[in-house]
Swiss-Prot record:
Catalysed reactions listed for this entry: 2 (2R)-3-phosphoglycerate + 2 H(+) = D-ribulose 1,5-bisphosphate + CO2 + H2O; D-ribulose 1,5-bisphosphate + O2 = 2-phosphoglycolate + (2R)-3-phosphoglycerate + 2 H(+)
One cellular-component annotation, GO: chloroplast
Location of this chain's protein in the cell: Plastid, Chloroplast
Pfam family, one: RuBisCO_large_N
Gene designation per UniProt: rbcL
GO biological process: photorespiration; reductive pentose-phosphate cycle
Residues modified to N6,N6,N6-trimethyllysine: 14
Catalytic machinery residues: 175 (proton acceptor), 294 (proton acceptor)
EC code: 4.1.1.39
Family indicated by similarity: Belongs to the RuBisCO large chain family. Type I subfamily.
Protein name per UniProt: Ribulose bisphosphate carboxylase large chain
Note: The basic functional RuBisCO is composed of a large chain homodimer in a 'head-to-tail' conformation. In form I RuBisCO this homodimer is arranged in a barrel-like tetramer with the small subunits forming a tetrameric 'cap' on each end of the 'barrel'.
Record function comment: RuBisCO catalyzes two reactions: the carboxylation of D-ribulose 1,5-bisphosphate, the primary event in carbon dioxide fixation, as well as the oxidative fragmentation of the pentose substrate in the photorespiration process. Both reactions occur simultaneously and in competition at the same active site.
Enzyme category, top tier: lyase
C-alpha cells in the first residue's frame, strides 16, 4: 500500500468510543425557557455510574450514538445535543436516580407529539447500560405548546354546547361491551340517557365487528339520543368510537357522525396513535364535534414503577395532541390510582398553570398559556356509594362514568341512571350547603335514598362491594 492511500485511525478525526458523560453531563448548564425538560428514573446496570447513565440517556435521546462519527464535525453539537444537567438519588430506593435532561427546542418538529416521543423515548429504553428507565415528567415550554391546537374545544366550550353547569357530568359505558346487536345497543343507550345520564359510551374495543357494524351502531345510537333529548329536554351525547384500522376509515366514521348531528365522537389514542389522534382532533374542532379519549393500553406503558412512562406524561401529550375528555383513573374503584398523584395529573389536564409539587409527582412548573383544558373521566368499578368521594376528589370539571354501576341496577338501565343522577345531585347540593362529603358522604346518600326508590335499590345492591386485591 502506498503512503498516499494508507489509512490510520489517527488520521481525520479522533475516532473510538467515548464516555457519554464527557459531552452530555453538564451540571453547570442553566436551562432555557425554550428547553423541553425531562425527568427520568434510571436504574443503571451494576458498575455504571449514575452520571454516565444520565448522560447516556441525554445522548441517545438526542444527537449521540455509540461512537464518534466524522459527520459530527459538520454541525454544532453544542447547539443540538441534550444535556443531563442534574442528578438526584431516589429516596428509599437502591441504585435508582432521577437524571434531569434539557433538550433544545430545535430538535423537535412543531405540532408533532409523534416526533417528540420518537426522539425522547423512541430508542433509549433498550440501552444496555440501563437496567430500567422510566420517563416521569416533561416540561413543555410555551414556545412548543403554542405550536399545537390542543383539545378541539375545551371545558368551557363543552359546557356551553351542552348547557350543563355547576356539577360533574354523568356517563355510562354500555355493557356487555361486546356481543349486542346494534338495535339492542341503541335501546340500552336510550334507557340510560332517558334516566338522567348526560352521556353513554362505546367501550374501547367496540369498533366494527361482525355482530355490530359501525354504521348500524351509529344510526341506532343517534336515534336513541334524539329520542332521549326530546323526552327529557336535556342535551345528550353518546361517545361514538371512530377508532379504526386506518386513518382514512377513522375519518370516514367521524364524518358520518357529524352528518348525523351527534355532539361527540371517541378515539383510543394510544392504540390508534398520536398522528391519527391529532388529525381527528383537528377535524373535530373544524366541525363542532367534541372528542372523548380512551387510554386503552396505558397500563402496558405506565404501570411499572421503574420502567416505561408515567401517565402524567401521556396526559400532557394528550392535551397537546387533542381531546376534550380523557380517562384518568378513579382513586376509589377497581382500577389503580393514588389520590395525590392522580390529582396531580388531573390538574395538568385542566389548569392553565401548575406549580412544581413533588408530593403530587409534578417535577416541573407547567405553563399551558392558552391551551384549552381536558375533562378527566373517572371510570372503572364505581357505584353510588362512591359518589360523595368522587364529587369531592374530582370537583365539577369532570365526567363520572358508571358502567356496571348503572347497568347492574336490579330494575334495569333507566332506574340505574336515575339512581346515579339522584346521588350526584344530592352530593352537589350537600357540598354547596357546606357539608363535608368525606365525613358525611354515606349519610348524604342514605338521606337521598329515602326520596328515590331507584337509589335505595342501588344502595342495597352495592352496599358491600369492594375491590381488594
Amino acid at each position: 500500500m502506498s503512503p498516499q492511500t494508507e489509512t490510520k485511525a489517527s488520521v481525520g478525526f479522533k475516532a473510538g468510543v467515548k464516555d457519554y458523560k464527557l459531552n452530555y453531563y453538564t451540571p453547570d448548564y442553566e436551562t432555557k425557557d425554550t428547553d423541553i425538560l425531562a425527568a427520568f428514573r434510571v436504574t443503571p446496570q451494576p458498575g455504571v455510574p449514575p452520571e454516565e447513565a444520565g448522560a447516556a440517556v441525554a445522548a441517545e435521546s438526542s444527537t449521540g450514538t455509540w461512537t464518534t462519527v466524522w459527520t459530527d464535525g459538520l454541525t454544532s453539537l453544542d447547539r443540538y445535543k441534550g444535556r443531563c444537567y442534574h442528578i438526584e438519588p431516589v429516596a428509599g430506593e437502591e441504585n435508582q436516580y432521577i437524571p434531569y435532561v434539557a433538550y433544545p427546542l430545535d430538535l423537535f418538529e412543531e405540532g408533532s407529539v409523534t416526533n417528540m416521543f420518537t426522539s425522547i423515548v423512541g430508542n433509549v429504553f433498550g440501552f444496555k447500560a440501563l437496567r430500567a428507565l422510566r420517563l416521569e415528567d416533561l416540561r413543555i415550554p410555551p414556545a412548543y405548546s403554542k405550536t399545537f391546537q390542543g383539545p378541539p374545544h375545551g371545558i368551557q366550550v363543552e359546557r356551553d354546547k351542552l348547557n350543563k353547569y355547576g356539577r360533574p357530568l354523568l356517563g355510562c359505558t354500555i355493557k356487555p361491551k361486546l356481543g349486542l346487536s346494534a338495535k339492542n345497543y341503541g335501546r340500552a343507550v336510550y334507557e340510560c340517557l332517558r334516566g338522567g345520564l348526560d352521556f353513554t359510551k362505546d367501550d374501547e374495543n367496540v369498533n366494527s365487528q361482525p355482530f355490530m357494524r359501525w354504521r348500524d351502531r351509529f344510526l341506532f345510537c343517534a336515534e336513541a339520543l334524539y329520542k332521549a333529548q326530546a323526552e327529557t329536554g336535556e342535551i345528550k351525547g353518546h361517545y361514538l368510537n371512530a377508532t379504526a384500522g386506518t386513518c382514512e376509515e377513522m375519518m370516514k366514521r367521524a364524518v358520518f357522525a357529524r352528518e348525523l348531528g351527534v355532539p361527540i365522537v371517541m378515539h383510543d389514542y394510544l392504540t390508534g396513535g398520536f398522528t391519527a389522534n391529532t388529525s381527528l382532533a383537528h377535524y373535530c374542532r373544524d366541525n363542532g364535534l367534541l372528542l372523548h379519549i380512551h387510554r386503552a393500553m396505558h397500563a402496558v406503558i405506565d404501570r411499572q414503577k421503574n420502567h416505561g412512562m408515567h401517565f402524567r406524561v401521556l396526559a400532557k401529550a394528550l392535551r397537546m395532541s387533542g381531546g376534550d375528555h380523557v380517562h384518568a383513573g378513579t382513586v376509589v374503584g377497581k382500577l389503580e390510582g393514588e389520590r395525590d398523584i392522580t390529582l396531580g395529573f388531573v390538574d395538568l389536564l385542566r389548569d392553565d398553570f401548575i406549580e412544581k409539587d413533588r408530593s403530587r409527582g409534578i417535577y416541573f412548573t407547567q405553563d399551558w398559556v392558552s391551551l384549552p383544558g381536558v375533562l378527566p373521566v373517572a371510570s372503572g368499578g364505581i357505584h353510588v356509594w362512591h359518589m360523595p368521594a368522587l364529587t369531592e376528589i374530582f370537583g365539577d370539571d369532570s365526567v363520572l362514568q358508571f358502567g356496571g354501576g348503572t347497568l347492574g341496577h336490579p330494575w334495569g338501565n333507566a332506574p340505574g341512571a336515575v339512581a346515579n343522577r339522584v346521588a350526584l345531585e344530592a352530593c352537589v347540593q350537600a357540598r354547596n350547603e357546606g357539608r363535608d362529603l368525606a365525613r358525611e358522604g354515606n349519610e348524604i346518600i342514605r338521606e337521598a335514598s329515602k326520596w328515590s326508590p331507584e337509589l335505595a335499590a342501588a344502595c342495597e345492591v352495592w352496599k358491600e362491594i369492594k375491590f381488594e386485591f
